[in-house]
Amino acid sequence: MSEVIVITSGKGGVGKSTVSALLGEAFAFKKSPVLLLELDSGLRSLDVALGVSEHILFDMGDIIRGSCETKDAIINCPFCPNLSLIAAAAKPVAVTEETIRKIIAEFGNYYEFIILDCPAGIGPELENAAKCADLGLVVETP
């Protein structure tokens, strides 16, 4: 089963998504399969950081609305074969604990690490992600 790591901060702009992307890449380059799960709906950025924006067909919003199967929203990073991403919803949507747990249950045996890239601040997304995580990392300053 995957080790689930939540990445968070008290405010925006401190580098959460950068830390998430680089941590994911570091694990992936060591041959550990990694799934980045971006939870900052309406403000996604991991697709840009990983250079996969043009590959997004479905995102977390589509999973939540039932417009696609979860596996169809997974984007494999072309320069890092062990790194995959589910991009945040393009428009704000509530990501429930149930949704996160469903993804972990469905893909936990395929990925050694699942990294939950949370939105800034303390809110329901962080609370839901933290309930599902084994480890947490708080980014304090840029």
Task: State what each model feature region is.
Residues 2-40:
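Walker A/P-loop phosphate-binding motif and the immediately C-terminal alpha-helix
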Residues 9, 38, 87-90, 118, ...:
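Flexible glycine-/small-residue-rich
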Residues 19, 69, 121:
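Residue-level recognition of oxygen-bearing side chains
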Residues 24, 101-104, 130:
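Short amphipathic alpha-helical segments and helix-helix/interface helices
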Residues 33, 82, 134-135:
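Residues at the starts of beta-strands that form the adenosine-phosphate
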Residues 36-109:
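P-loop/Walker-type NTP enzyme "switch/lid" segment
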Residues 108-109, 113-142:
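Conserved catalytic-core segment of NTP-binding enzymes
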